[in-house]
Amino acid sequence: DLRDSHIKELDEGKTESLWVSGKIGHPIIKAFNNVLGDTLAEKGRKKGDEGRLAAAAAGDSAEDKAVVMRLIDEAGFDPVDGGTLEESWRQQPGTPCYCCDYNKEEMEKALQEAVPGKAPGVRDAINDHLMHLAKAPTHEEIIQVNRGAHHKE
């Protein structure tokens, strides 16, 4: 509701990636949606560097996904296979892997921890929290809010 009106198919559970693919009439690979802009701009690292973060890619064509996963690697992130487009809900806003600046192992675990149907409520709670802060949150504060939504200590 932050930007777009409701779309019936999405409200009924269709993944955004499948909906977009159907609308444009072409297959897609979903990637880079689960990292913040500052992460993309500032946190890419060489392969093997300590602290290298990960980004997930989901899609139905293994060949196309392999190309995108190479791009993720070239951008300075460890690529993680996020499954098919049907499974791409696991990297939507409000899921455990979304905008948390995780390394490869943490990203793989977070993708598996996603619970069907839970993300919209978590996403809305995160957005509500961030919109009611006294000042714009820093990159690190956004990461902490996203992580905290799933890992209460």
List each model region and its residues.
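Active-site-lining helix/loop region of Rossmann-like oxidoreductase modules
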Residues: 50-153
